C-alpha cells in the first residue's frame, strides 16, 4: 500500500510550476528532482541497494549519453547525433583516473557494444562503475535510437554512504499529469527496494532545479 498521498504530490507539482511562472524565465528547462531521505538504515551494515526503473515519460530529454562502440555502433551513433567513442579513443585515456572521472562527469549515462563492454574494466579501470555509470549493453539486434530513449526514461536509485539521494523525475516542459505518473512510479519502485519499505522512508521532497523544495511525505 502506497503511503504517498496523491493530493500532496499534485499540490507540490503545481506549486513548483507556479513558482517557475512567477520567477524570471531561465534560459534552460528546469529539471524536477525527487529528493529522498531514509531512516533506520545503516549503509555500513545493511545491503546497499541499487536498482533502475523505466519511467512512463522521459524526465531529461537533453540527457547526455555516450556510445562506447564498435565500428558499426559508432557509425549508427553518428547518424542519430549521439556522441560516441571507439576502443582506440578509450585506450588513449590510458586508465588515467582523472581522465576517466572527467569522462564519467561529462555524461549522464553510457551505452556499449558487446565487444567493447568486456574490455571496459581493462581499458578504463573501475572509474565508471564507481560513478554508478557502468554502460548498458546494446546488441546489434536492437535499435540504437530506441535504446537511447529507453536510457533517457530510466532512473537509477543507488544507496551510497549517506542516507539521502535524488533522482530526476521530470522537467518543467512536461504536463502535470506526466510528472505525477513519473513521481508515483519512482516512489513505489524505491520503496520496493527498501528493507522495511515505507518504514525506511524519512522524507520525500520534490524540487525544481532553481526552486524551493516541496515536502510530499
UniProtKB/Swiss-Prot annotation:
Entry's Gene Ontology BP terms: translation
KW Magnesium (keyword) present: no
Keyword Chaperone in record: no
Xref: PROSITE patterns: RIBOSOMAL_L1
Pfam families found in the cross-reference section: Ribosomal_L1
Keywords: Ribonucleoprotein, Ribosomal protein
GO molecular function: RNA binding; structural constituent of ribosome
GO cellular component terms attached to this protein's record: cytosolic large ribosomal subunit; cytosolic ribosome; nucleolus; plastid
Family: Belongs to the universal ribosomal protein uL1 family.
Subunit structure and binding partners: Interacts with the GTPase NUG2.
Protein known as: Large ribosomal subunit protein uL1x
Organism of origin: Arabidopsis thaliana (Mouse-ear cress)
